Amino acid sequence: MKSHLAALALLALAASLLGQPASAATVRVQAGQDLQAAVQAAAPGDTVEVERGFYRVNLRIDKALTLRGVGRPTLSGGQVGDSIRVTAPDVVLEGLIVRDSGTSLKDQNAGIYIYPGAHRAVVRKNDLTYNLFGLWIEKAQDVVIEGNL
């Protein structure tokens, strides 16, 4: 009887551990490094911290992660397309200067474009400047927008 209880307790513990998500990592990107490569290498749930600097990028985020600026880094789309395009749910963007989207009304170019299905995005404390649309949200639910300029 005791061995059965011990086995059940061990199975319950193993099942609870299997259900736990792996610990999220924090990746730090410095000016001059490839920000898109860092985002692609990140696992869902990770945080990518972007240090102060100028990044010429049309960033695509297709997994749940946090992109956090450290010291207000500037992400410039180079006046082509979207500066940041979010296609996954549960993405957090905070502390960034996002600028220089493209100018196509047909394509709805934006500094930050939240695509259909990118539910529960959080856009917090960013400066959106020199963009056709600072922030464009299309068919995404429960998006939080706080303290942006």
Spell out what each predicted region is.
Residues M1-H4:
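Positively charged n-region of N-terminal signal peptides that target proteins for export
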Residues A7-L17:
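Bacterial N-terminal signal peptides
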Residues A15-A41, T66:
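Right-handed parallel beta-helix/beta-solenoid
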Residues Y130, L135-L149:
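Solenoidal tandem-repeat scaffolds enriched in leucines and small polar residues
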Residues D46-V50:
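Extracellular beta-strand repeat scaffolds in secreted/surface proteins
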Residues Q36, Q40, P44, F54-R68, ...:
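Extracellular beta-strand-rich solenoid/capping regions of secreted or surface-exposed proteins
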